[in-house]
Amino acid sequence: MTTFSPREIVSELDRYIVGQADAKRAVAIALRNRWRRQQLQGPLREEVAPKNILMIGPTGCGKTEISRRLARLANAPFLKVEATKFTEVGYVGRDVEQIVRDLVEVGIGLKRDEKRRSVQAKAEAAAEARILDALVGPTASQATRDSFRRRLRAGELDDKEVELELAGSATAGLPMFEIPGMPGAAMGAINLGDMLGKALGGQRGRPRRITVRDAHAPLMTEESDKLLDQDTIIQEAIREVEDNGIVFLDEVDKICAREGRGGADVSREGVQRDLLPLIEGTTVATKYGPVKTDHILFIASGAFHVSKPSDLLPELQGRLPIRVELAPLTVDDFRRILTETEASLLKQAVALMATEGVTVTFTDDAVDALARVAVDVNSSVENIGARRLQTVLERVLDEISFAAPDRSGEIVTIDAAYVRERVESLAQNADLSRFIL
Protein backbone atom coordinates (compact mmCIF):
# COMPACT_ATOMS: atom_id res chain seq x y z
CA MET A 1 0.00 0.00 0.00
CA THR A 2 1.30 3.46 -0.90
CA THR A 3 2.51 5.77 1.87
CA PHE A 4 2.43 8.90 -0.32
CA SER A 5 0.83 11.99 1.22
CA PRO A 6 -2.19 13.51 -0.61
CA ARG A 7 0.05 16.33 -1.88
CA GLU A 8 2.54 13.81 -3.33
CA ILE A 9 -0.25 11.81 -4.98
CA VAL A 10 -1.68 14.95 -6.62
CA SER A 11 1.82 15.96 -7.72
CA GLU A 12 2.31 12.55 -9.35
CA LEU A 13 -1.07 12.76 -11.13
CA ASP A 14 -0.19 16.28 -12.33
CA ARG A 15 2.65 14.80 -14.39
CA TYR A 16 0.15 13.03 -16.64
CA ILE A 17 -3.22 14.78 -16.26
CA VAL A 18 -3.94 18.48 -16.83
CA GLY A 19 -6.37 20.29 -14.52
CA GLN A 20 -9.16 18.48 -12.64
CA ALA A 21 -7.76 19.48 -9.23
CA ASP A 22 -10.94 18.48 -7.35
CA ALA A 23 -10.92 14.93 -8.71
CA LYS A 24 -7.22 14.53 -7.97
CA ARG A 25 -7.69 15.79 -4.40
CA ALA A 26 -10.63 13.43 -3.82
CA VAL A 27 -8.79 10.29 -4.95
CA ALA A 28 -5.61 11.39 -3.12
CA ILE A 29 -7.50 11.80 0.17
CA ALA A 30 -9.31 8.48 -0.35
CA LEU A 31 -6.00 6.73 -1.01
CA ARG A 32 -4.37 8.31 2.05
CA ASN A 33 -7.34 7.32 4.20
CA ARG A 34 -6.53 3.67 3.43
CA TRP A 35 -3.16 4.17 5.11
CA ARG A 36 -4.68 6.15 8.01
CA ARG A 37 -7.13 3.33 8.76
CA GLN A 38 -4.25 0.85 8.95
CA GLN A 39 -2.71 2.94 11.75
CA LEU A 40 -5.85 2.58 13.94
CA GLN A 41 -6.12 -0.17 16.54
CA GLY A 42 -8.98 -2.23 17.90
CA PRO A 43 -12.69 -2.00 17.08
CA LEU A 44 -12.45 1.52 15.63
CA ARG A 45 -10.40 0.21 12.71
CA GLU A 46 -13.25 -2.11 11.71
CA GLU A 47 -15.79 0.71 11.99
CA VAL A 48 -14.00 3.10 9.60
CA ALA A 49 -15.59 2.54 6.20
CA PRO A 50 -14.17 3.92 2.95
CA LYS A 51 -15.86 7.01 1.47
CA ASN A 52 -16.69 5.88 -2.05
CA ILE A 53 -16.42 8.43 -4.87
CA LEU A 54 -18.58 9.31 -7.89
CA MET A 55 -16.71 11.23 -10.61
CA ILE A 56 -18.90 13.08 -13.10
CA GLY A 57 -17.54 14.74 -16.21
CA PRO A 58 -17.74 14.84 -20.00
CA THR A 59 -15.93 12.22 -22.05
CA GLY A 60 -12.23 12.82 -22.63
CA CYS A 61 -11.67 15.04 -19.58
CA GLY A 62 -9.44 12.62 -17.64
CA LYS A 63 -11.67 10.28 -15.58
CA THR A 64 -10.27 7.04 -16.98
CA GLU A 65 -6.73 8.41 -17.12
CA ILE A 66 -6.91 9.19 -13.38
CA SER A 67 -7.81 5.54 -12.76
CA ARG A 68 -4.91 4.28 -14.91
CA ARG A 69 -2.37 6.42 -13.10
CA LEU A 70 -3.90 5.64 -9.70
CA ALA A 71 -3.46 1.92 -10.38
CA ARG A 72 0.31 2.42 -10.63
CA LEU A 73 0.42 4.62 -7.54
CA ALA A 74 -1.80 2.54 -5.28
CA ASN A 75 0.59 -0.39 -4.69
CA ALA A 76 -2.52 -2.31 -3.66
CA PRO A 77 -4.98 -4.65 -5.42
CA PHE A 78 -6.59 -2.38 -8.02
CA LEU A 79 -9.19 -3.34 -10.63
CA LYS A 80 -10.73 -1.19 -13.35
CA VAL A 81 -13.96 -2.54 -14.83
CA GLU A 82 -16.73 -1.18 -17.06
CA ALA A 83 -20.19 -1.35 -15.52
CA THR A 84 -21.62 -2.22 -18.95
CA LYS A 85 -19.94 -5.66 -18.85
CA PHE A 86 -22.27 -6.95 -16.17
CA THR A 87 -25.86 -8.18 -16.18
CA GLU A 88 -28.42 -8.80 -13.48
CA VAL A 89 -28.11 -12.13 -11.65
CA GLY A 90 -30.16 -14.73 -13.50
CA TYR A 91 -29.47 -13.30 -16.96
CA VAL A 92 -26.82 -14.56 -19.35
CA GLY A 93 -23.56 -12.71 -18.73
CA ARG A 94 -21.25 -11.84 -15.86
CA ASP A 95 -22.71 -10.92 -12.49
CA VAL A 96 -21.15 -8.16 -10.38
CA GLU A 97 -19.62 -10.58 -7.86
CA GLN A 98 -17.10 -11.37 -10.60
CA ILE A 99 -15.56 -7.96 -9.77
CA VAL A 100 -14.43 -9.28 -6.38
CA ARG A 101 -13.19 -12.56 -7.85
CA ASP A 102 -11.13 -10.66 -10.41
CA LEU A 103 -9.80 -8.37 -7.66
CA VAL A 104 -8.69 -11.42 -5.66
CA GLU A 105 -6.82 -12.73 -8.71
CA VAL A 106 -5.08 -9.34 -9.02
CA GLY A 107 -4.22 -9.42 -5.30
CA ILE A 108 -2.76 -12.94 -5.53
CA GLY A 109 -0.68 -11.90 -8.54
CA LEU A 110 0.70 -8.88 -6.64
CA LYS A 111 1.46 -10.90 -3.52
CA ARG A 112 3.10 -13.70 -5.54
CA ASP A 113 5.33 -11.18 -7.34
CA GLU A 114 6.29 -9.64 -3.99
CA LYS A 115 7.19 -13.06 -2.53
CA ARG A 116 9.10 -14.05 -5.67
CA ARG A 117 11.26 -10.96 -5.32
CA SER A 118 12.13 -11.99 -1.76
CA VAL A 119 13.45 -15.41 -2.93
CA GLN A 120 14.97 -14.16 -6.18
CA ALA A 121 18.60 -14.90 -5.25
CA LYS A 122 17.88 -18.53 -4.27
CA ALA A 123 15.70 -19.05 -7.36
CA GLU A 124 18.44 -17.58 -9.56
CA ALA A 125 20.98 -20.05 -8.19
CA ALA A 126 18.61 -23.02 -8.63
CA ALA A 127 17.70 -21.98 -12.20
CA GLU A 128 21.39 -21.59 -13.07
CA ALA A 129 22.12 -25.06 -11.66
CA ARG A 130 19.39 -26.62 -13.82
CA ILE A 131 20.69 -24.91 -16.96
CA LEU A 132 24.22 -26.12 -16.15
CA ASP A 133 22.89 -29.66 -15.67
CA ALA A 134 21.29 -29.46 -19.10
CA LEU A 135 24.49 -28.09 -20.67
CA VAL A 136 27.18 -30.33 -19.15
CA GLY A 137 25.22 -33.05 -17.32
CA PRO A 138 24.88 -33.57 -13.57
CA THR A 139 28.03 -35.75 -13.42
CA ALA A 140 30.43 -33.14 -14.88
CA SER A 141 33.45 -32.13 -12.83
CA GLN A 142 33.37 -28.98 -10.73
CA ALA A 143 36.01 -27.34 -12.94
CA THR A 144 33.85 -27.91 -16.05
CA ARG A 145 30.76 -26.54 -14.31
CA ASP A 146 32.69 -23.45 -13.12
CA SER A 147 33.96 -22.84 -16.66
CA PHE A 148 30.46 -23.09 -18.14
CA ARG A 149 29.03 -20.99 -15.30
CA ARG A 150 31.39 -18.14 -16.19
CA ARG A 151 30.42 -18.35 -19.86
CA LEU A 152 26.72 -18.54 -18.92
CA ARG A 153 26.94 -15.40 -16.76
CA ALA A 154 28.83 -13.60 -19.52
CA GLY A 155 25.97 -14.33 -21.94
CA GLU A 156 28.11 -16.42 -24.31
CA LEU A 157 25.69 -19.39 -24.18
CA ASP A 158 22.42 -17.46 -24.60
CA ASP A 159 21.72 -18.84 -28.09
CA LYS A 160 22.64 -22.44 -27.29
CA GLU A 161 19.71 -24.90 -27.23
CA VAL A 162 19.19 -27.16 -24.22
CA GLU A 163 16.61 -29.78 -23.33
CA LEU A 164 14.69 -28.98 -20.16
CA GLU A 165 11.66 -30.39 -18.39
CA LEU A 166 9.34 -27.50 -17.56
CA ALA A 167 6.31 -28.00 -15.33
CA GLY A 168 2.90 -27.38 -16.84
CA SER A 169 4.11 -27.40 -20.44
CA ALA A 170 1.70 -30.18 -21.38
CA THR A 171 -1.34 -28.09 -20.50
CA ALA A 172 -0.01 -24.56 -21.04
CA GLY A 173 -1.93 -23.99 -24.27
CA LEU A 174 -5.30 -25.10 -22.96
CA PRO A 175 -7.80 -22.25 -22.53
CA MET A 176 -10.06 -21.02 -19.79
CA PHE A 177 -13.73 -20.69 -20.60
CA GLU A 178 -16.60 -19.12 -18.74
CA ILE A 179 -19.90 -20.72 -17.91
CA PRO A 180 -22.42 -17.86 -18.26
CA GLY A 181 -24.53 -17.13 -15.22
CA MET A 182 -23.01 -19.91 -13.14
CA PRO A 183 -23.27 -18.66 -9.55
CA GLY A 184 -21.63 -19.38 -6.22
CA ALA A 185 -18.85 -21.86 -5.71
CA ALA A 186 -18.39 -22.70 -9.38
CA MET A 187 -17.00 -19.17 -9.91
CA GLY A 188 -18.14 -19.06 -13.51
CA ALA A 189 -14.82 -20.17 -15.03
CA ILE A 190 -13.22 -23.52 -15.76
CA ASN A 191 -9.53 -23.89 -16.52
CA LEU A 192 -9.05 -26.85 -18.84
CA GLY A 193 -5.36 -26.97 -17.91
CA ASP A 194 -6.24 -27.51 -14.24
CA MET A 195 -8.86 -30.12 -15.10
CA LEU A 196 -6.69 -32.16 -17.45
CA GLY A 197 -3.32 -31.45 -15.80
CA LYS A 198 -2.96 -34.79 -14.05
CA ALA A 199 -4.35 -36.78 -16.97
CA LEU A 200 -1.87 -35.18 -19.40
CA GLY A 201 1.06 -35.06 -16.97
CA GLY A 202 0.89 -31.30 -16.66
CA GLN A 203 2.64 -31.23 -13.29
CA ARG A 204 5.51 -33.47 -14.42
CA GLY A 205 6.04 -31.58 -17.66
CA ARG A 206 7.75 -32.96 -20.74
CA PRO A 207 11.18 -32.29 -22.19
CA ARG A 208 11.38 -29.22 -24.43
CA ARG A 209 14.19 -27.88 -26.57
CA ILE A 210 14.65 -24.23 -25.75
CA THR A 211 17.44 -21.65 -25.92
CA VAL A 212 19.25 -20.71 -22.72
CA ARG A 213 17.97 -17.12 -23.04
CA ASP A 214 14.32 -18.23 -23.30
CA ALA A 215 14.70 -20.83 -20.54
CA HIS A 216 15.68 -18.31 -17.87
CA ALA A 217 12.22 -16.77 -17.23
CA PRO A 218 10.17 -20.03 -16.93
CA LEU A 219 12.90 -21.63 -14.80
CA MET A 220 12.97 -18.61 -12.47
CA THR A 221 9.17 -18.77 -12.11
CA GLU A 222 9.25 -22.51 -11.44
CA GLU A 223 12.10 -22.37 -8.91
CA SER A 224 10.57 -19.35 -7.14
CA ASP A 225 7.23 -21.13 -6.81
CA LYS A 226 8.95 -24.16 -5.27
CA LEU A 227 10.25 -21.89 -2.51
CA LEU A 228 6.86 -20.26 -1.82
CA ASP A 229 3.95 -21.41 0.32
CA GLN A 230 0.92 -20.94 -1.94
CA ASP A 231 -1.59 -21.15 0.93
CA THR A 232 0.15 -18.30 2.76
CA ILE A 233 0.17 -16.20 -0.42
CA ILE A 234 -3.59 -16.71 -0.88
CA GLN A 235 -4.39 -15.87 2.76
CA GLU A 236 -2.26 -12.71 2.70
CA ALA A 237 -3.68 -11.66 -0.68
CA ILE A 238 -7.27 -12.03 0.52
CA ARG A 239 -6.44 -9.96 3.62
CA GLU A 240 -4.83 -7.31 1.40
CA VAL A 241 -7.88 -7.23 -0.90
CA GLU A 242 -10.29 -6.90 2.04
CA ASP A 243 -8.30 -4.08 3.68
CA ASN A 244 -6.81 -2.16 0.74
CA GLY A 245 -8.61 -3.25 -2.45
CA ILE A 246 -9.74 -0.53 -4.86
CA VAL A 247 -12.33 -0.96 -7.63
CA PHE A 248 -12.68 1.68 -10.34
CA LEU A 249 -16.15 1.30 -11.88
CA ASP A 250 -16.18 3.10 -15.23
CA GLU A 251 -19.18 3.95 -17.46
CA VAL A 252 -21.57 3.82 -14.50
CA ASP A 253 -23.89 6.26 -16.30
CA LYS A 254 -24.61 3.56 -18.91
CA ILE A 255 -26.47 1.43 -16.35
CA CYS A 256 -28.89 4.22 -15.43
CA ALA A 257 -32.52 3.51 -16.24
CA ARG A 258 -33.24 6.78 -18.02
CA GLU A 259 -36.15 8.78 -16.69
CA GLY A 260 -39.49 8.09 -18.35
CA ARG A 261 -38.15 5.17 -20.32
CA GLY A 262 -39.54 1.69 -19.75
CA GLY A 263 -39.56 -1.50 -21.79
CA ALA A 264 -37.32 -4.53 -21.79
CA ASP A 265 -34.29 -2.73 -20.39
CA VAL A 266 -34.40 -4.81 -17.22
CA SER A 267 -30.73 -5.52 -16.70
CA ARG A 268 -29.69 -1.87 -16.22
CA GLU A 269 -31.45 -1.25 -12.92
CA GLY A 270 -30.80 -4.87 -11.93
CA VAL A 271 -27.05 -4.28 -12.15
CA GLN A 272 -27.43 -1.25 -9.87
CA ARG A 273 -29.39 -3.34 -7.35
CA ASP A 274 -26.71 -6.06 -7.46
CA LEU A 275 -24.01 -3.43 -6.86
CA LEU A 276 -25.70 -2.16 -3.68
CA PRO A 277 -24.64 -4.98 -1.30
CA LEU A 278 -21.21 -5.18 -2.94
CA ILE A 279 -20.49 -1.50 -2.26
CA GLU A 280 -22.17 -1.47 1.16
CA GLY A 281 -20.30 -4.59 2.31
CA THR A 282 -21.05 -8.25 1.79
CA THR A 283 -19.23 -11.58 1.63
CA VAL A 284 -18.48 -13.00 -1.81
CA ALA A 285 -17.62 -16.66 -2.34
CA THR A 286 -14.50 -17.19 -4.44
CA LYS A 287 -12.56 -20.35 -5.23
CA TYR A 288 -9.95 -19.20 -2.69
CA GLY A 289 -12.50 -18.71 0.08
CA PRO A 290 -14.96 -16.02 1.22
CA VAL A 291 -13.98 -12.36 0.73
CA LYS A 292 -15.56 -9.46 2.65
CA THR A 293 -16.10 -6.23 0.70
CA ASP A 294 -16.76 -3.92 3.69
CA HIS A 295 -13.47 -2.01 3.30
CA ILE A 296 -12.98 -2.16 -0.48
CA LEU A 297 -12.94 1.38 -1.94
CA PHE A 298 -15.22 1.91 -4.96
CA ILE A 299 -14.63 4.82 -7.34
CA ALA A 300 -17.42 5.16 -9.91
CA SER A 301 -17.23 7.43 -12.93
CA GLY A 302 -19.47 8.39 -15.82
CA ALA A 303 -20.03 11.09 -18.40
CA PHE A 304 -23.78 11.37 -17.71
CA HIS A 305 -24.44 12.88 -21.15
CA VAL A 306 -27.89 11.37 -21.58
CA SER A 307 -28.75 10.44 -18.02
CA LYS A 308 -28.19 12.36 -14.77
CA PRO A 309 -26.58 11.20 -11.52
CA SER A 310 -30.03 11.50 -9.94
CA ASP A 311 -31.20 8.73 -12.32
CA LEU A 312 -29.11 6.27 -10.32
CA LEU A 313 -30.99 4.37 -7.62
CA PRO A 314 -31.18 6.56 -4.49
CA GLU A 315 -29.58 3.77 -2.46
CA LEU A 316 -26.62 3.66 -4.87
CA GLN A 317 -26.25 7.44 -4.73
CA GLY A 318 -26.11 7.17 -0.93
CA ARG A 319 -23.30 4.62 -1.16
CA LEU A 320 -21.22 7.05 -3.26
CA PRO A 321 -21.11 9.98 -0.80
CA ILE A 322 -18.22 11.96 -2.33
CA ARG A 323 -19.26 13.55 -5.61
CA VAL A 324 -16.65 15.22 -7.83
CA GLU A 325 -17.41 17.10 -11.03
CA LEU A 326 -14.69 17.29 -13.67
CA ALA A 327 -14.62 20.42 -15.81
CA PRO A 328 -14.71 20.42 -19.63
CA LEU A 329 -11.32 21.20 -21.16
CA THR A 330 -10.46 24.68 -22.43
CA VAL A 331 -8.03 25.83 -25.16
CA ASP A 332 -5.38 26.43 -22.50
CA ASP A 333 -5.90 22.90 -21.14
CA PHE A 334 -5.43 21.45 -24.64
CA ARG A 335 -2.24 23.47 -25.04
CA ARG A 336 -0.89 22.12 -21.75
CA ILE A 337 -1.90 18.56 -22.66
CA LEU A 338 0.16 18.86 -25.84
CA THR A 339 3.26 20.26 -24.16
CA GLU A 340 3.42 19.75 -20.38
CA THR A 341 2.42 16.15 -19.66
CA GLU A 342 5.07 13.48 -19.13
CA ALA A 343 4.30 11.51 -22.30
CA SER A 344 2.46 14.16 -24.33
CA LEU A 345 1.17 13.48 -27.83
CA LEU A 346 3.79 15.80 -29.34
CA LYS A 347 6.64 14.00 -27.55
CA GLN A 348 5.27 10.67 -28.79
CA ALA A 349 4.99 11.94 -32.37
CA VAL A 350 8.52 13.39 -32.36
CA ALA A 351 9.96 10.15 -30.93
CA LEU A 352 8.13 7.99 -33.49
CA MET A 353 9.39 10.07 -36.42
CA ALA A 354 12.92 10.04 -34.96
CA THR A 355 12.98 6.25 -35.42
CA GLU A 356 12.83 6.92 -39.19
CA GLY A 357 15.58 9.55 -38.97
CA VAL A 358 13.13 12.45 -39.44
CA THR A 359 13.43 15.35 -36.97
CA VAL A 360 10.02 16.94 -36.38
CA THR A 361 9.66 20.22 -34.49
CA PHE A 362 6.46 22.06 -33.57
CA THR A 363 6.46 25.85 -33.27
CA ASP A 364 4.51 27.55 -30.47
CA ASP A 365 1.91 28.86 -32.91
CA ALA A 366 1.46 25.30 -34.26
CA VAL A 367 0.63 24.11 -30.73
CA ASP A 368 -1.87 26.98 -30.37
CA ALA A 369 -3.42 26.10 -33.74
CA LEU A 370 -3.75 22.40 -32.83
CA ALA A 371 -5.46 23.31 -29.54
CA ARG A 372 -7.77 25.82 -31.26
CA VAL A 373 -8.82 23.36 -34.00
CA ALA A 374 -9.53 20.62 -31.44
CA VAL A 375 -11.75 22.97 -29.42
CA ASP A 376 -13.56 24.23 -32.54
CA VAL A 377 -14.32 20.72 -33.82
CA ASN A 378 -15.42 19.63 -30.34
CA SER A 379 -17.84 22.55 -30.09
CA SER A 380 -19.24 22.17 -33.62
CA VAL A 381 -19.68 18.39 -33.77
CA GLU A 382 -19.46 16.31 -30.61
CA ASN A 383 -17.39 17.09 -27.55
CA ILE A 384 -15.06 14.12 -27.06
CA GLY A 385 -12.56 16.06 -24.97
CA ALA A 386 -8.82 15.46 -25.20
CA ARG A 387 -9.32 12.47 -27.52
CA ARG A 388 -10.03 14.99 -30.29
CA LEU A 389 -6.34 15.98 -30.20
CA GLN A 390 -5.41 12.53 -31.50
CA THR A 391 -7.70 12.99 -34.51
CA VAL A 392 -6.29 16.44 -35.30
CA LEU A 393 -2.65 15.45 -34.78
CA GLU A 394 -2.97 12.33 -36.94
CA ARG A 395 -4.44 14.45 -39.74
CA VAL A 396 -1.55 16.94 -39.46
CA LEU A 397 1.13 14.22 -39.43
CA ASP A 398 -0.51 11.99 -42.05
CA GLU A 399 1.71 13.03 -44.99
CA ILE A 400 4.92 13.06 -42.93
CA SER A 401 4.19 9.63 -41.42
CA PHE A 402 3.52 8.12 -44.84
CA ALA A 403 6.67 9.51 -46.47
CA ALA A 404 8.99 9.27 -43.42
CA PRO A 405 11.07 6.27 -44.67
CA ASP A 406 11.94 8.25 -47.84
CA ARG A 407 12.78 11.46 -45.94
CA SER A 408 15.39 10.14 -43.51
CA GLY A 409 17.76 12.87 -42.34
CA GLU A 410 15.32 15.72 -43.00
CA ILE A 411 14.22 18.34 -40.47
CA VAL A 412 10.50 19.12 -40.66
CA THR A 413 9.14 22.21 -38.92
CA ILE A 414 5.39 22.32 -38.36
CA ASP A 415 3.89 25.80 -37.93
CA ALA A 416 0.36 27.20 -37.67
CA ALA A 417 -0.01 27.61 -41.46
CA TYR A 418 0.86 23.93 -42.00
CA VAL A 419 -1.64 22.87 -39.32
CA ARG A 420 -4.45 24.98 -40.85
CA GLU A 421 -3.69 23.65 -44.33
CA ARG A 422 -3.80 20.00 -43.17
CA VAL A 423 -6.94 20.26 -41.01
CA GLU A 424 -8.97 22.53 -43.29
CA SER A 425 -10.88 19.57 -44.73
CA LEU A 426 -11.52 18.26 -41.20
CA ALA A 427 -13.19 21.52 -40.20
CA GLN A 428 -15.23 21.60 -43.44
CA ASN A 429 -16.41 18.03 -42.91
CA ALA A 430 -17.37 18.93 -39.37
CA ASP A 431 -19.49 21.84 -40.59
CA LEU A 432 -21.23 19.71 -43.22
CA SER A 433 -21.90 16.86 -40.81
CA ARG A 434 -24.40 19.01 -38.90
CA PHE A 435 -26.73 18.99 -41.91
CA ILE A 436 -26.56 15.23 -42.57
CA LEU A 437 -29.22 13.11 -40.96
From Swiss-Prot:
This protein's record includes keyword RNA-binding: no
Subcellular location(s) of the protein: Cytoplasm
SUPFAM superfamilies per the UniProt record, alphabetical: P-loop containing nucleoside triphosphate hydrolases
Highest taxon in the source lineage: Bacteria
CC annotations in GO: HslUV protease complex
Main location: cytoplasm
A GO MF term: proteasome-activating activity
Cross-referenced CDD domains: RecA-like_HslU
One GO BP: protein unfolding
Keywords per UniProt: ATP-binding, Chaperone, Cytoplasm, Nucleotide-binding, Stress response
UniProt-listed Gene3D superfamilies: 1.10.8.60, DNA helicase RuvA subunit, C-terminal domain, P-loop containing nucleotide triphosphate hydrolases
InterPro entries found in the cross-reference section: AAA+_ATPase (IPR003593), ATP-dep_Clp_protease_ClpX (IPR050052), ATPase_AAA_core (IPR003959), ATPase_dyneun-rel_AAA (IPR011704), Clp_ATPase_C (IPR019489), HslU (IPR004491), P-loop_NTPase (IPR027417)
SMART domains (alphabetical): AAA (SM00382), ClpB_D2-small (SM01086)
Positions contributing to ATP binding: 18, 60-65, 250, 315, 387
Function: ATPase subunit of a proteasome-like degradation complex; this subunit has chaperone activity. The binding of ATP and its subsequent hydrolysis by HslU are essential for unfolding of protein substrates subsequently hydrolyzed by HslV. HslU recognizes the N-terminal part of its protein substrates and unfolds these before they are guided to HslV for hydrolysis.
Family: Belongs to the ClpX chaperone family. HslU subfamily.
NCBIfam families recorded: hslU, PRK05201.1
Assembly: A double ring-shaped homohexamer of HslV is capped on each side by a ring-shaped HslU homohexamer. The assembly of the HslU/HslV complex is dependent on binding of ATP.
Name the UniProt record assigns to this protein: ATP-dependent protease ATPase subunit HslU
Gene (UniProt): hslU
